[in-house]
C-alpha cells in the first residue's frame, strides 16, 4: 500500500497529475480542492494517497491533507459511491461545504453534483452523519479547521479548454461544462479560478 508520495510535480492536467519520485512517474487523480493547493510544475509536492485495484486498472488518488483522504475513504464506504464519484464530490465542494450539507440534510445541493441522484444524496446524508461526527471529534487544530473550511483560493495557471476538459473528466456533460465555463470566464482568468467558479455556478 502506498500511503504518501513526495516528489517533483512534472504534469498538471486537472484532475490528473504526475509526480516524479526517484525517477518514477506516478500518475494520480486528485480532487480539485487539492489541485488548487498544488505548487507550480518542477516544484516539490507531498500527497497522501489511496490505492485502488480494479480488474481493469490500478488507480492512485492523491490528497494534500490526511483529512481530505480520510473523508474520501468515508465516502467510498457509502453504498453506491465509488472512487470516481467521491472525487467528483470533493471537487464540487470543500470538505466544510460537504459537512454542512450532511448536517443540514441538504439533498438539493448534493443532487446538483454529477452522478449524485436523490437516492445517493439521501444515503450520503444518512450514512455519513455519524461518520463525520467521529471524524470531526478526532480532528484538532488545523485538521478541524480544514474539515470546516467552506472556501478556498486558487493559485494561477492557464484557460477555457483546460477548464472544460477538467469538468468533463469529473463527470459533467461537455455542453454543460462548456456553458458553465463560458458563463464564468473573464479575460485573464486562470484555469483553477475558472474551474472553481464554473463548479460553483452548477451547485
Swiss-Prot record:
Kindly report the protein's main subcellular placement as a broad class.
Answer: cytoplasm
Give UniProt keywords alphabetically: Cytoplasm, DNA damage, DNA recombination, DNA repair, DNA-binding
Residues annotated as region Domain I? 1-64
Q: Which Gene3D superfamilies match?
A: 5' to 3' exonuclease, C-terminal subdomain (1.10.150.20), DNA helicase RuvA subunit, C-terminal domain (1.10.8.10), Nucleic acid-binding proteins (2.40.50.140)
State the Gene Ontology terms under molecular function: ATP binding; four-way junction DNA binding; four-way junction helicase activity
Query: GO CC annotations?
Result: cytoplasm; Holliday junction helicase complex; Holliday junction resolvase complex
Question: Which residue ranges are recorded for the region named Domain II?
Answer: 65-143
Record's subcellular location: Cytoplasm
Membrane-spanning segments? none
Give the record's subunit note: Homotetramer. Forms an RuvA(8)-RuvB(12)-Holliday junction (HJ) complex. HJ DNA is sandwiched between 2 RuvA tetramers; dsDNA enters through RuvA and exits via RuvB. An RuvB hexamer assembles on each DNA strand where it exits the tetramer. Each RuvB hexamer is contacted by two RuvA subunits (via domain III) on 2 adjacent RuvB subunits; this complex drives branch migration. In the full resolvosome a probable DNA-RuvA(4)-RuvB(12)-RuvC(2) complex forms which resolves the HJ.
Q: What is known of its domains?
A: Has three domains with a flexible linker between the domains II and III and assumes an 'L' shape. Domain III is highly mobile and contacts RuvB.
According to its UniProt record, which protein family does this protein belong to?
Belongs to the RuvA family.
Annotated function: The RuvA-RuvB-RuvC complex processes Holliday junction (HJ) DNA during genetic recombination and DNA repair, while the RuvA-RuvB complex plays an important role in the rescue of blocked DNA replication forks via replication fork reversal (RFR). RuvA specifically binds to HJ cruciform DNA, conferring on it an open structure. The RuvB hexamer acts as an ATP-dependent pump, pulling dsDNA into and through the RuvAB complex. HJ branch migration allows RuvC to scan DNA until it finds its consensus sequence, where it cleaves and resolves the cruciform DNA.
Q: What's the protein here called? A: Holliday junction branch migration complex subunit RuvA
Q: Which organism is it from?
A: Shewanella denitrificans (strain OS217 / ATCC BAA-1090 / DSM 15013)
Q: Taxonomic lineage per UniProt?
A: Bacteria, Pseudomonadati, Pseudomonadota, Gammaproteobacteria, Alteromonadales
